[in-house]
């Protein structure tokens, strides 16, 4: 998406006009304009010149934020300048300008109010020259009003330009209201002068009361007050983005030819060696090549606890080196750093529109013309009713100045910006406004097991030595671990790495082995201290040694707990069992519990067999476990789940990308792959599952805030316009002075923005106020329908399945059949329980399985 800066917009009608104009340009596929950040995002093949021309023809200004044709080196070299430009764009220049305008306006307005109302209402003294000189009084008021109008000429320039281009905006309403008050007052002044020349003092006094000079000036001053408050509040909504930008280091200390030199961070290139001392910010993303330290990553992840780092660990720009001297190699520089990508995500999200904003957009497109029409009808109606021109004009002007399209236009974007900033501070990044809105509507959360619910790194959980083998050894567990580590040292298997890590932690010495050989799918063999060591699963080791019933029972127990039992034997005797498991993260059960309390159904997807999967699922507390899912099968599972409700898929790996894309909402755990992050709608910077309910909570709070803003914006206009038009005057005698209408208009936008700022108080990790599921949602997502209850199951007995991969092959083949809705396969029991959605012959089922080189012995 190409970004542009748009100038001259003052309300929602302006942004709607720009969006409509650019959308008509040939080659533009989508366009989104943000009134809040004065930015525009455009997708398509149209050139910058075409887009800028379209905006200018609509009566506004535009300029590209960057060039799409830059080379990678250019991008890196210009990253600091781009960052400075982005920071510069967020500087609040509006508030100081508006403050100066307001002060100047008030100086003239106070004098005007003294002469126009002070003497008349409270009897304040006037200079001798003005006593009885009504024409001089009128001329003084005219001059003071002209001064205020000149100071606030921006309203007239913008308002009448919009009217000329057929795109009236909020400034048009203000300009028309003020100009109408001024124009009628000038007419009254000339008429009064003529009456005084003719000696008609009754007419003179009558016309004196028809002066609306103070209204013309007061409208401008009050609207400026509202604009200043609004600009100040809008500046607060971008605080999170500005604070992120301020984190970016300006310089880096690199090592060239053995000499340290300080250079600008935008001059650092990929592969450069840089050093960071304690207390310094890390300048770019890199990998530690020398030294150890603790790094405070709270700027990026929101996690305040420092993370220990050692050689080969990754470090990110803007994080703080707290304790040690480290030397690093730059891996990502310029706009490719994690910090730059976060800033880009947050700013891109601000440039997009939430679907709910379309309501306000549709109204804003016709709002101003409708208000002008209502004002004209109001004036005509009161004149027909026999009221004076002054009375009718006052009612029409009140309609113009009380109507506020700004409140409608700001209702959604300010809440989105604040919500996005709040999320960024907590390490939760929403890529678009639509994703921030949709996350809270999730009904089903599908969790990938590995790396999401679990840590993704197998660890040794149990060491069970065979006491008969280690009769002469004191530390039996340590002795077994020493044998295992010595054999596994030459293996690249993930389970071997878990054993080596445990041996390192326990300071177990590793001996050298010879004749190492890996038996694919079974285990490995090696000679250690003259003994033939065999390691692997039960089926492999039991071919060479006798395994006692107690040890077999222990292995079954481990399997039920989701652990993988590894057997070790020396010559013809069993040494023992070491259980390895991918342990669940500490926060996973609590995260699942919170999601369930929100009324969200939680499903776990895994390629493990049913037994292992159910054990992990039970520990995590999920509602449903779908086991035996191959990497390319996750997308199909998500497709099925989407038939039951809105689905959010949470994953971290490359093989999760298709499922993340298929889901209504893709959520990537931050420690995962770049591919998964690219495919996701929401990125969790911390690898914590507890951030998933936090994201849902923040989304719901933002959506509630948007609804509140839209309600008050609509409610304000629905109540205010009839009151201003004098609808209640015949019944209750209520009428609204144009000055009070202007004051109300000023406060409406300020109130909407202030309400959005309340999102900063949202406690995203506090589950106390979570909404429960409605009965309809629960029934929809948690209960099977009648056709599912009536579905038929068949149990197939299958020979030849040896591992989880075998299970997955059989499961995939069976579920590819149209008549099969689900297949639960277990290689340990040698069965496949098939759930059928329609009739299918046993022969077809048998043929399908045997095509995968397995033998079906019976079907029940």
Model feature map: region roles:
Residues 16, 29, 442, 528-530, ...:
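Conserved ATP-binding TGD loop and adjacent catalytic N/P-domain core of P-type ATPases
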Residues 460, 464-598, 610, 622-638:
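P-type ATPase nucleotide-binding
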Residues 26-43, 48, 210-211, 242-336, ...:
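Conserved cytosolic catalytic loops of P-type ATPases
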Residues 192-196, 201-203, 217-278, 309, ...:
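Juxtamembrane coupling segments of multi-pass membrane pumps/enzymes
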Residues 121-135, 164, 183, 422, ...:
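Membrane-embedded alpha-helical bundles of multi-pass transporters
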Residues 97-251, 362, 463, 733-738, ...:
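Transmembrane helix-loop-helix hairpins at the membrane interface
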Residues 1-136, 259-260, 344-352, 761-860:
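Flexible metal-binding regulatory segments at protein termini and peripheral loops
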Residues 86-108, 158-181, 343-375, 392, ...:
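Soluble-to-membrane junctions at the N-terminal ends of transmembrane alpha-helices
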């Amino acid at each position: 998406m190409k970004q542009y800066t748009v100038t001259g917009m003052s309300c929602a009608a302006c942004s709607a006009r720009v969006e409509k104009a650019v959308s008509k340009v040939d080659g533009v596929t989508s366009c989104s304009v943000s009134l809040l950040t004065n930015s525009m995002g455009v997708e398509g093949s149209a050139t910058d010149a075409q887009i800028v021309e379209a905006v200018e023809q609509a009566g506004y200004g535009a300029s590209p934020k960057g060039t799409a044709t830059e080379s990678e080196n250019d991008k890196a070299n210009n990253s600091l300048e781009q960052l400075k430009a982005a920071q510069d764009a967020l500087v609040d220049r509006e508030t100081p300008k508006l403050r100066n305008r307001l002060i100047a306006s008030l100086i003239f307005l106070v004098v005007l109010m003294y002469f126009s109302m002070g003497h008349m209402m409270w009897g304040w003294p006037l200079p001798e020259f003005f006593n009885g000189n009504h024409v001089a009084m009128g001329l003084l008021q005219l001059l003071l009003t002209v001064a205020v109008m000149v100071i606030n000429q921006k309203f007239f320039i913008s308002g009448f330009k919009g009217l000329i281009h057929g795109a009236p905006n909020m400034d048009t309403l203000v300009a028309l209201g003020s100009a109408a008050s001024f124009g009628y007052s000038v007419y009254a002044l000339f008429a009064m002068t003529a009456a005084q020349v003719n000696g008609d003092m009754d007419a003179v006094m009558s016309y004196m009361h028809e002066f609306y000079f103070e209204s013309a000036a007061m409208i401008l001053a009050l609207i400026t007050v509202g604009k200043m408050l609004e600009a100040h509040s809008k500046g607060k909504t971008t605080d999170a983005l500005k604070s992120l930008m301020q984190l970016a280091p300006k310089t880096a200390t690199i090592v060239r030819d053995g000499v340290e030199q300080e250079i600008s961070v935008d001059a650092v290139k990929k592969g450069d060696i840089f050093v960071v001392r304690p207390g310094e910010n890390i300048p770019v993303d890199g990998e530690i090549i020398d030294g150890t330290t603790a790094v405070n990553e709270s700027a990026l992840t929101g996690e305040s606890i420092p993370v220990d780092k050692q050689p080969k660990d990754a470090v990110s720009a803007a994080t703080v080196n707290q304790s040690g001297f480290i030397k690093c190699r730059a891996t990502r520089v310029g706009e490719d750093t994690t910090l730059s990508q976060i800033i880009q995500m947050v700013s891109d999200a601000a440039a997009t529109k939430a679907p709910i904003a379309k309501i306000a957009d549709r109204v804003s497109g016709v709002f101003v013309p409708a208000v002008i029409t209502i004002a004209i009808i109001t004036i005509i109606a009161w004149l027909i009713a026999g009221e004076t021109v002054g009375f009718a004009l006052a009612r029409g002007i009140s309609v113009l100045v009380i109507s506020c399209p700004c409140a409608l236009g700001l209702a959604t974007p300010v809440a989105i910006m604040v919500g996005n900033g709040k999320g960024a501070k907590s390490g939760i990044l929403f890529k678009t406004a639509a994703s921030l809105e949709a996350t809270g509507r999730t009904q089903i959360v599908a969790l990938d097991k590995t790396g999401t619910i679990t840590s993704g790194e197998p660890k040794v959980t149990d060491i069970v030595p065979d006491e008969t083998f280690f009769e002469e050894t004191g530390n039996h567990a340590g002795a077994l671990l020493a044998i295992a580590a010595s054999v596994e040292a030459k293996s690249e298997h993930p389970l071997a790495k878990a054993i080596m890590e445990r041996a390192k932690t326990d300071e177990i010495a590793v001996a050298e082995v010879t004749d190492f050989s890996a038996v694919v799918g079974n285990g490995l063999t090696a000679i250690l201290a003259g003994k033939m060591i065999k390691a692997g699963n039960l089926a492999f080791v039991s071919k060479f040694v006798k395994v006692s019933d107690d040890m077999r029972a222990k292995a079954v127990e481990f399997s039920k707990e989701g652990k993988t039992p590894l057997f070790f034997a020396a010559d013809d005797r069993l040494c023992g069992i070491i259980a390895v498991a991918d342990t669940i993260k500490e926060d996973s059960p609590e995260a699942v519990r919170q999601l369930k309390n929100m009324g969200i159904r939680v499903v776990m997807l895994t390629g493990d067999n049913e037994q292992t999967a159910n054990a992990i699922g039970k520990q995590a507390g999920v509602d449903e476990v779908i086991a035996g899912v191959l990497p390319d099968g996750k997308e199909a599972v998500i497709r099925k789940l989407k038939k039951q409700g809105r689905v959010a898929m949470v994953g971290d790996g490359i093989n999760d990308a298709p499922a993340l894309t298929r889901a209504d909402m893709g959520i990537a755990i931050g420690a995962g792959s770049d591919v998964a992050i690219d495919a996701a709608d929401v990125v969790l910077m911390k690898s914590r599952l507890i951030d998933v309910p936090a994201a849902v909570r923040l989304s719901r709070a933002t959506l509630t805030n948007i609804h509140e803003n839209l309600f008050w914006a609509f409610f304000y206009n629905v109540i205010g316009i009839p009151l201003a038009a004098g609808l209640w005057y015949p019944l209750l005698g209520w009428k609204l002075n144009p000055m009070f209408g202007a004051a109300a208009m000023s406060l409406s936008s300020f109130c909407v923005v202030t309400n959005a700022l309340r999102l900063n108080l949202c406690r995203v990790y506090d589950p106390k106020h979570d909404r429960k599921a409605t009965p309809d949602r629960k029934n929809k997502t948690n209960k099977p329908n009648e056709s599912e209850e009536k579905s038929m199951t068949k149990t197939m007995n299958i020979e030849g399945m040896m591992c989880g991969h075998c299970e997955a092959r059989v499961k995939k083949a069976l579920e590819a059949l149209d008549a099969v809705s689900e297949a639960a396969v277990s290689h340990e029991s040698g069965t496949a329980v098939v759930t059928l959605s329609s009739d299918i012959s046993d022969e077809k089922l048998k043929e399908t399985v045997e095509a995968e080189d397995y033998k079906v012995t019976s079907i029940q």
